[in-house]
């Protein structure tokens, strides 16, 4: 059978080859249209957009429009930028349109390629999201590619970190929106915490193209997006615990670098117990008594912070704050914080201000966020090694798009040394040799610390003309990358994965124009200078080519082969020559943690001397085996995370859909009535179980519950003494009494007031209980793994118990909402004749009547002066001034003020 399979592949081609053959035929159809579209005027070409939209309305599909739409974009790109998408870019665009992942080598024009499917799918008017890894790339691509879309009559928006809600809403309303994965995810979570539909910014999830798709959907898949709020301040306790760790010795704890965990030994536990006892914080006799659970958590975090997390590798200290470094891209991630007290432990370790711990308010993983899109696709330079994961988790096929020109880069064999010192001596020697012939060099390191150590070595060797690109200097990233291809340039970079910028030999013309001519106005002089820059870059490129092209030197193998391939792929863009080489040592993290312990002995037996390298197929296979082992482990972690998050995701969908229904509903009376009836039925069933005798009824408890929930005093004891009374009759009487009380409240407060309160109480209660539920799920997730020791499947246990917690939350929701709506009171504040002082009371706060003060709804006070209606902001009541009771409400509801916002004043 194997022989037949091999024969079939040779005869018919692989599935990948057959797919490319079909796509090439489609590309030919587009090429046939090129001459026809060249003859169109700019106006005629622009009108194609309206023509395509009309045809879609009449029933045509985007698939049928593809050849003409792609031909339109190709012609627009030629006219706007004098850039013509190659056939391979047409193929890549079709892969993206068909919900696939296009693997294209660095420098092959992914950004321009993406304009083809973006335009085609934007014609439907449902929004296209283009996802990038950072704000710089989102802004750059929106600005440059937006000119092509603008030429064709489409609107382009960009979401940046510091935009307010109105600007975000406007950007999402555009035909095409560029944004980072983080901003998209957080906007989705914030939308599902909004009080009103008008506060939401996104408009759905129709089609997304993810740039650097492997970085976002693979590398970052393990990290959930979390919106959190502060808990109590425990600064002193964190500082105290932090003082314990330096007193420990290596025999007091164990570190598993492979699993990234730390544990105390028996000796270490005894030491910690003594220190806690002296500080007066040990409860009970043992550290592991139930009363000390929180303390154990803090101590484990402190140990992890000191022994597992390395400054300038995992994080940096910047402006008195701990800033996390992305392990895959080497970029800083400002605003991101480790959860569960780990970030506070790092702050205590580095003696910076400790921020309060946070409580999760809402969370989602990128895996579940991006699976919400009706159409999803991606592009990257390296995806084949992760093809199985893309297919299993996202249902995306990876297609390797051919290069426009053959690759001329020479990938040399790895050089393996016994020690890191020998390795770095060899790297410096190689850099010197290449630098002397003016070959541009890119050196890839795995951490800030190692990049700066290498920089210091180069200085000592007299090589000073180099640049360092790491998280410390990320603001200069674009410029450093742009100049990395200049002859004689030496660039030391931390993790080139996901940089999104290719290195052009001779330098980047656009960057030089921006840098050198930023203050020069348009005119003949500027045009002449631009021509000079172009000529200079051309000459520099010729020199770089003569020196052998870009030389990529890697100082370590990464855990993932894909990251190594990304670094290699920086050389040899668009058919340019180049070379790459990896320098390794047995002291590298990958070799030390995952490699074979016998490798060092084997090298010694082979007679390896100091400063000698070994190049052997057996060594290369061992390295690849170690990398595959790590990749498999990380894949399992991500799959496992998804299984657990899928459980929460099902519950999240229910809650978010319920919130959306409440926000959109004009009348929630039926929902409230249904909740109230279920609460009454549950109460009666609990204290007067069906089919039981009166002697078994707990009348006292039922009366207490009715008083607590509804503020009702009913003669249930008297009813229970009636001859032949049944639980159904008592249920009916209680229901009638509750309905009567509710009707009285409606008469007192008007339907508008009740509608507002129904919505406010429902949303506020759902949000509060959902936050608490997330905490419960976090706790359950952290301990459920131990069920495996009892021969029970942790995942099944998690599913069962999380469902029970969810059902309990829904029951609690019904009780709390019913109780609040049956007990609230409004205190009307009389308007004094004098102009009151301005008071910023904030958002409405609903207090429970059982508290010291009676229940009160507060709203921002209105300043007692008249304001021109044109100057009033409908969404900001503080700008309305004095509003007449019979005027139309400034909010835009078309109701009279006294029946709308004026009802609360």
From Swiss-Prot:
Residues that, per the record, bind Zn(2+): 889, 891, 900-901
Region annotation (Disordered) ranges: 837-885
Gene3D superfamilies: 3.10.450.50, Helical scaffold and wing domains of SecA, P-loop containing nucleotide triphosphate hydrolases, SecA, preprotein cross-linking domain
SUPFAM superfamilies registered for this protein in UniProt: Helical scaffold and wing domains of SecA, P-loop containing nucleoside triphosphate hydrolases, Pre-protein crosslinking domain of SecA
GO cellular component, one term: plasma membrane
Binding site for ATP: 89, 107-111, 502
Protein name per Swiss-Prot or TrEMBL: Protein translocase subunit SecA
Keywords: ATP-binding, Cell inner membrane, Cell membrane, Cytoplasm, Membrane, Metal-binding, Nucleotide-binding, Protein transport, Translocase, Translocation, Transport, Zinc
Keyword hit for ATP-binding: yes
Chief site of localization: membrane
Subunit structure comment from the entry: Monomer and homodimer. Part of the essential Sec protein translocation apparatus which comprises SecA, SecYEG and auxiliary proteins SecDF-YajC and YidC.
Cofactor note: May bind 1 zinc ion per subunit.
Compartments where located: Cell inner membrane; Cytoplasm
InterPro entries assigned: Helicase_ATP-bd (IPR014001), Helicase_C-like (IPR001650), P-loop_NTPase (IPR027417), SEC_C_motif (IPR004027), SecA (IPR000185), SecA_CS (IPR020937), SecA_DEAD (IPR011115), SecA_motor_DEAD (IPR014018)
Chain intervals with Polar residues compositional bias: 852-865
Bilayer topology: Peripheral membrane protein
Organism lineage string: Bacteria, Pseudomonadati, Pseudomonadota, Alphaproteobacteria, Hyphomicrobiales
The keyword Nucleotide-binding belongs to this UniProt entry's keyword annotation: yes
Cofactor(s) it depends on: Zn(2+)
Domain of life, source organism: Bacteria
Record-level GO BP terms: intracellular protein transmembrane transport; protein import; protein targeting; protein transport by the Sec complex
Catalytic activity: ATP + H2O + cellular proteinSide 1 = ADP + phosphate + cellular proteinSide 2
Function of the molecule: Part of the Sec protein translocase complex. Interacts with the SecYEG preprotein conducting channel. Has a central role in coupling the hydrolysis of ATP to the transfer of proteins into and across the cell membrane, serving both as a receptor for the preprotein-SecB complex and as an ATP-driven molecular motor driving the stepwise translocation of polypeptide chains across the membrane.
GO molecular function, one term: protein-exporting ATPase activity
Classification via SMART domains: SecA_DEAD (SM00957), SecA_PP_bind (SM00958)
Protein family membership: Belongs to the SecA family.
